[in-house]
Amino acid sequence: MNERGRKRVLLGTVVSNKMDKSVVVEVERLVQHRVYKKYITSHKKYAAHDETQLCQIGDMVKITESRPLSKTKRFRVSEIVKKAV
């Protein structure tokens, strides 16, 4: 299979939109503990590029991997799945 054209797509929640054209998205995933085999929720925060500046805190967004846009930004907001209440 061709791995070169495949880009990671992650689903997460916007936790910060204070920057200009950037948001911080927190992605949750289940990870199994190596010894105890219990599933634990792990969190990771990604800086993502938001060109339209429509994302608000609490929105559920889909982010797609892209070329490096800055020191920390490697993702773009591809769509807003669910708006915050």
UniProtKB/Swiss-Prot annotation:
Disulfide cross-links: none
Listed GO molecular functions? rRNA binding; structural constituent of ribosome
Q: Name one GO biological process term.
A: translation
Q: Name one GO cellular component term.
A: cytosolic small ribosomal subunit
Keywords of this protein's UniProt record, alphabetized? Ribonucleoprotein, Ribosomal protein, RNA-binding, rRNA-binding
Gene3D superfamilies on file: Nucleic acid-binding proteins
Domain of life per record = Bacteria
Identify its protein family: Belongs to the universal ribosomal protein uS17 family.
Main role? One of the primary rRNA binding proteins, it binds specifically to the 5'-end of 16S ribosomal RNA.
Subunit (UniProt): Part of the 30S ribosomal subunit.
Query: PANTHER family from the xrefs?
Result: 40S RIBOSOMAL PROTEIN S11 FAMILY MEMBER (PTHR10744), SMALL RIBOSOMAL SUBUNIT PROTEIN US17M (PTHR10744:SF1)
Name of the protein in its database record: Small ribosomal subunit protein uS17
Q: Which organism is it from?
A: Desulforapulum autotrophicum (strain ATCC 43914 / DSM 3382 / VKM B-1955 / HRM2) (Desulfobacterium autotrophicum)
